Every structure is written in structure tokens, then in C-alpha cells.
Amino acid sequence: PEDMDTPRNVYKVSTQNPGSDVAAETAAALAAASIVFKDSDPSYSGKLLHTAMKVFDFADRYRGSYSDSIGSVVCPFYCSYSGHHDELLWGASWIHRASQNRSYLVYIKSNGHILGEDDDGFSASWDDKETGTKVLLVSKSFLERHVEEFQLYKAHSGNYICSLLPGTSNFQGQYTPGGLLYKASESNLQYVTSTTLLLLTYAKYLRTNGGVATCGSSKVTAETLISEAKKQVDYILGNNPAKISYMVGFG
């Protein structure tokens, strides 16, 4: 929706100047896209998935952060502050989701401890994929055959979801007087939109499995999560004290 006429320089990572974070993120995007096209265009879907695997292999084989390779042009605004480990798990999780190739499941199990499995994250953004990965890993299509092996992911993702919900004993979030989730003083909406996606994804998981989330002494249903997500989206689109839309080209 934006017209941009400013220079958009292109940079690359390589075996000598690695960028596991940006490469694994690319692999994740390609794998996710392959799921979208699986039924309507199987050939294209297969090409996307094959490319995702190749890009992920590059990301894993030549480890390092793109901030260290081309930091002079990406920092401080787009430094990889979370490092590259979270993207490696993110990429492997999406490729497994798309392919059901067990080798990626083995990769996640073998590398999870090193790449962030033990960390209980409370942020979701373009830079930090840790929480997003854990929510992805508890989705029914991934966990129905491997539930016991990923209980830690399920516990961490549940802690994250509960931390966002006012009225629960696990609540750790901050909201503005108008009701917008507040994560950072700069570019806050990126965190709001990422968090909203995770709320809806977790709600879908709950609905599919016919369960509820336990937040301390509170029981939270999928409908509660959907309602909170809707409040955030409505706020962004204009249902806020200022009565303005924060989405370019809408409202």
C-alpha cells in the first residue's frame, strides 16, 4: 500500500559471510508457502519445499548471524539481536510441517537444547522467533503423534499465551488505557500483530483438540483468545480513542 522511490540496495550472505538467521527465515517462508500451494499447484509447491530444504541446509551448515556479516548496513535498526539460533529451529519446524520428513523432527529434538528450547520467551517479532516456533510446534498437525516429546514447548507456549491475558494469575502484559497491547515504545504495532497471530494460532490448536488453556487457577477457552486478538486488530483498524486507522491505505 506504500509507494517508495528511495534506493533499495540488495545484499547477500555467503559461505564466507554467513547469515543463518536470514537464510533459515527464508527457508521457513518457502516451506510455509509450499503448504499454501500444495493442493492447487503441487508442482510449484514441491519446488518451494525443495528450495526451502536447500536454503535451510546452507543456513545450518554455515552458521552465523547476518549482523556480523553485513552489520554496517543493517544495524542498528535491523540487527539480529536474538541471534540466529531461533531462526534455525523456526526453519526446521516449518519444513517438517510442510514435508513431514522425520529428519527435521530429529534435528529439532537434537538441537533444541542448544538453540533455545529451554528458554521461556515472552516476545514475538521479526527478529525473535523463539515463541513463534513453540506455538507452531504445539499445533495439532505437528504434535498429534509426538506429544510427549514436546511437552516443554507446549508448557512454554502456554505460559506465553497466559501472560497476555488480564485477569489470570500468569498475567505479565501491559496494555495502554485504550486497550492496545504495549511491548515497546518504538514500532509497537509489529509486536501487537505478531502476538495477535500467535493468539489465533493457539486458539485454533485449542479448538481442534477441544481443550482449554490452564492459566494458574483460570481456564481459558479458544473464544477468549480470539476475542482478545479481535480487540487488537480492531484497535489497529480504527476502533481506538483517536478513531484513526494505523494501517496504511485503510480507514
Swiss-Prot record:
Pfam family, one: Glyco_hydro_9
Any one of the GO BP annotations: cellulose catabolic process
Function, in words: Degrades carboxymethylcellulose (CMC).
Catalysed transformations (reactions): Endohydrolysis of (1->4)-beta-D-glucosidic linkages in cellulose, lichenin and cereal beta-D-glucans
Similarity section: Belongs to the glycosyl hydrolase 9 (cellulase E) family.
GO molecular function: cellulase activity
Main enzyme class: hydrolase
The protein's name: Endoglucanase CX
Signal peptide span: none
EC number assigned by the record: 3.2.1.4
Source species: Prunus persica
Origin superkingdom: Eukaryota
Keywords: Carbohydrate metabolism, Cellulose degradation, Glycosidase, Hydrolase, Polysaccharide degradation
Keyword Metal-binding attributed: no
